[in-house]
Amino acid sequence: MAVTNQMVAPRYAKALLEAAKDQNQVETVHEELQALQSVFNDNPTILTIFDNARITAADKDALMTTLTKDASPLVANLLKLTQQYGRFGALPAIISAFNQAYDEEAGIIAATVTTAVALSADQADALRSTIAARFGMKSTQLDQVVDPSVIGGVRIQARGSVIDGTVKHRFDKMKAALLAD
């Protein structure tokens, strides 16, 4: 069975987080990984360069030197290790898994809130508090989506759960009940 990036990412992320905690470098590593993610988002071809046989070893070494130049030893070692084991393309998944573990350690939950109109600052703060309490976390990182088709109410998506209190959802449930045998 082939091991996918999604399978190895949590292992690398957990090991990196533990090493960062041991060296009191969690914040530094987190910031560097966010910067790396931006580089990969802006230049996605970087992720495939190390697998490309047409690119010389010297060019690959030069790229690795550039990527690790300002990196902490932990992040530099992660880059070199993933390249060495042919997992460089897994870095976005590893960064995502690290971010999840980091948020979990910090007591932060990521949630997407969909409403028909933009939330006021007070409404957003109230939702953050409610979501954090509901999931037993300290705070909520809120991503707000405005979708007029929900008509009213709020849909919250967090940790694979959906809490749908929208008017559209209620209408859909009523319609299904009316059409049921």
Curated annotation (Swiss-Prot):
Belongs to the ATPase delta chain family. The gene is atpH. Its main location: membrane. One of its GO terms (molecular function) is proton-transporting ATP synthase activity, rotational mechanism. InterPro entries: ATP_synth_OSCP/delta_N_sf, ATPase_OSCP/dsu. It is found in: Cell membrane. NCBIfam families: ATP_synt_delta. It is a peripheral membrane protein. F-type ATPases have 2 components, F(1) - the catalytic core - and F(0) - the membrane proton channel. F(1) has five subunits: alpha(3), beta(3), gamma(1), delta(1), epsilon(1). F(0) has three main subunits: a(1), b(2) and c(10-14). The alpha and beta chains form an alternating ring which encloses part of the gamma chain. F(1) is attached to F(0) by a central stalk formed by the gamma and epsilon chains, while a peripheral stalk is formed by the delta and b chains. F(1)F(0) ATP synthase produces ATP from ADP in the presence of a proton or sodium gradient. F-type ATPases consist of two structural domains, F(1) containing the extramembraneous catalytic core and F(0) containing the membrane proton channel, linked together by a central stalk and a peripheral stalk. During catalysis, ATP synthesis in the catalytic domain of F(1) is coupled via a rotary mechanism of the central stalk subunits to proton translocation. This protein is part of the stalk that links CF(0) to CF(1). It either transmits conformational changes from CF(0) to CF(1) or is implicated in proton conduction. Keywords: ATP synthesis, Cell membrane, CF(1), Hydrogen ion transport, Ion transport, Membrane, Transport. The keyword Mitochondrion does not apply. GO terms for cellular component: plasma membrane; proton-transporting ATP synthase complex. This is ATP synthase subunit delta. Pfam families: OSCP. The keyword Manganese does not apply.
